[in-house]
């Protein structure tokens, strides 16, 4: 195979890796946890991964405790958990 063909193949494989969604076995376990507002009474907009809908959704976070399925931005949620 020519060097041009190898570069094309490498580029296609790289693109495939970037565009392939995270599989459920590679997703962190905390992404399966339910949204948890925690016991505090603040009102912060946050995002959590919803495993049934396979997307990130908004929820209100109280500001303390809760769990790890809690992200400040939807992009952070998607990068970490979304398939």
Curated annotation (Swiss-Prot):
InterPro entries: Kunitz_BPTI, Kunitz_BPTI_sf, Prtase_inh_Kunz-CS, TFPI/VKTCI-like
Pfam family, one: Kunitz_BPTI
Keyword Ligase: no
Signal sequence region: 1-24
GO cellular component, one term: extracellular space
Subcellular location per the Swiss-Prot or TrEMBL entry: Secreted
Cysteine-cysteine disulfides: 31-81, 40-64, 56-77
Function per UniProt: Serine protease inhibitor.
Descriptive protein name: Kunitz-type serine protease inhibitor superbin-2
Species assigned in the record: Austrelaps superbus (Lowland copperhead snake)
Lineage, broadest ranks: Eukaryota, Metazoa, Chordata, Craniata, Vertebrata
């Amino acid at each position: 195979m020519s060097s041009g063909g190898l570069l094309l193949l490498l580029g296609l494989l790289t693109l495939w890796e970037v565009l392939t969604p995270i599989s459920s076995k590679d997703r962190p376990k905390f992404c399966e946890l339910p949204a948890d507002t925690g016991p505090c009474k603040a009102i912060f907009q946050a995002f959590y991964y919803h495993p049934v809908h396979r997307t990130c959704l908004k929820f209100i976070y109280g500001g303390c405790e809760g769990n790890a399925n809690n992200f400040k931005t939807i992009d952070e949620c998607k990068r970490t958990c979304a398939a």
